[in-house]
Structures are given as C-alpha cells and as structure tokens.
Curated annotation (Swiss-Prot):
GO molecular function annotations of the record: protein homodimerization activity
Family to which the UniProt record says this protein belongs: Belongs to the ParD antitoxin family.
Organism: Caulobacter vibrioides (strain ATCC 19089 / CIP 103742 / CB 15)
Taxonomic lineage from the root: Bacteria, Pseudomonadati, Pseudomonadota, Alphaproteobacteria, Caulobacterales
Gene: parD1
The protein's name in its UniProt record: Antitoxin ParD1
Phenotype on disruption: Cannot be disrupted, suggesting it is a functional antitoxin. No visible phenotype when the parDE1 operon is deleted.
A Pfam family hit: ParD_antitoxin
Annotated keywords: Toxin-antitoxin system
Amino acid sequence: MASKNTSVVLGDHFQAFIDSQVADGRYGSASEVIRAGLRLLEENEAKLAALRAALIEGEESGFIEDFDFDAFIEERSRASAPQGFHEE
C-alpha cells in the first residue's frame, strides 16, 4: 500500500489526546493514532450505511398489519397446547 504524506491541523484537545496515547505507549506515533481513528470512523460509516439500507428495505417492504401482542400470545398458547387436550 502506497503512503501519502498529508498535513492536518489539530486543535489543542486532539493534539493533547494524541500526545497522551503515544506517551502512554499505546501507539508508536501520531500517525498510528490517526490511522486507528480513521479505521474506527470507516467501520462506523459502514455500519451506518448497512443500517440505512436495512431501514429502507423495511420501509419498502410495505405495511402488513398492526401487531396485536395479546392475540400473538393467545395463538402461541394454542399452538403449544398438547393435541387432543380440552379443558372442561
């Protein structure tokens, strides 16, 4: 992978954060900290894109009917009751 030297301007807050990460030994250089942050941003953007696609798919799937929780429970109870069982 080819590298490109890019210059960025950071505020005091982010510069101090980068410096502390390097000083603590978590990263070997400011570039490593920036790359780690960019990887997280890239992962987050991919997750957001997948979520947006799922939302659109759900919206386009159409509206079936309102969900009736009580009817759902009743149906599940009937389905799980032993066959031939009749309450008297």
